[in-house]
Each structure stands twice: as structure tokens, then as C-alpha cells.
């Protein structure tokens, strides 16, 4: 077996691509792709890994709350056998996903939210939302 070096983000995308659910003996890919708004906090990690994995579709969203509602609606249509990963930038982008997450939780709809983050040791200039 050959070792394959991956970043954490690349390994995460590989892991998500290989998740399956089984019902009545039929296996389905669990994640149909990723919906997201790339910004500070997720471009360098998840954004780059998604760009390198063209077989895991990425769809640009325009609103974080709508993105989560879209993923939940897709999961409902697919009878909870398939859903989307949702990613956003840090700060308000991440908090805008909370309403959609609450609605999905109440309705027992699977969605995976991956908000952006920054390195704890990173020394950056004082920029809004960091």
C-alpha cells in the first residue's frame, strides 16, 4: 500500500466522497456535493481541496441560510438518502447558517455544515470579521 500525503481539507473531502448509506440493499452516495460561499476562513483549506476534486461537485450559493435550506430540501426530496455539505466563511457567514440548521434539526433532515475558521496562531492585520 502506498502512502498518500493529504492536507486535512483534502482528507476531509476524500472522506465525504466515500460516504454511503444503504437502504433495502441499495447503496447510495450520501453527499451529492458541496454548496458554499467561499471567503476568509475556508478558501485556503476546503476551497482548495474542492477545486482539486472535480468529481465532488461544488455549487456557489448566494446566501448562507438559503444554502442550508436548499440542502435540507434536497435531502427531503431524496428521502434522506442523500444531502449536501454546506460551507461558509467565518463570522456572519457561519451564523447565517444557524436558522437553516435549526429547521433541518427540527425536521430530522441530514445536512453537514462546515463553517470556516482561521489558524489560532495566525497573526493577521485587524480586518473585519477575523
Residue map of PLM features:
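N-terminal alpha/beta PP-like core and its mobile active-site loop of ThDP/TPP-dependent enzymes
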Residues: 2-130
Amino acid at each position: 500500500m502506498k502512502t498518500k500525503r493529504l492536507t486535512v481539507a483534502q482528507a476531509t473531502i476524500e472522506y465525504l466522497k466515500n460516504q454511503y448509506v444503504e437502504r433495502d440493499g441499495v447503496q447510495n452516495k450520501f453527499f451529492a456535493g458541496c454548496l458554499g460561499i467561499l471567503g476568509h476562513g475556508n478558501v485556503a483549506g476546503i476551497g482548495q481541496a474542492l477545486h482539486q476534486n472535480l468529481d465532488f461537485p461544488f455549487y456557489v450559493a448566494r446566501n448562507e441560510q438559503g444554502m442550508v435550506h436548499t440542502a435540507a430540501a434536497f435531502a427531503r426530496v431524496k428521502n434522506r438518502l442523500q444531502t449536501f455539505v454546506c460551507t461558509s466563511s467565518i463570522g456572519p457567514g457561519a451564523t447565517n447558517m444557524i436558522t437553516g440548521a435549526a429547521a433541518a434539526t427540527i425536521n430530522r433532515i441530514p445536512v453537514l455544515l462546515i463553517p470556516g475558521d482561521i489558524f489560532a496562531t495566525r497573526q493577521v492585520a485587524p480586518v473585519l470579521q477575523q
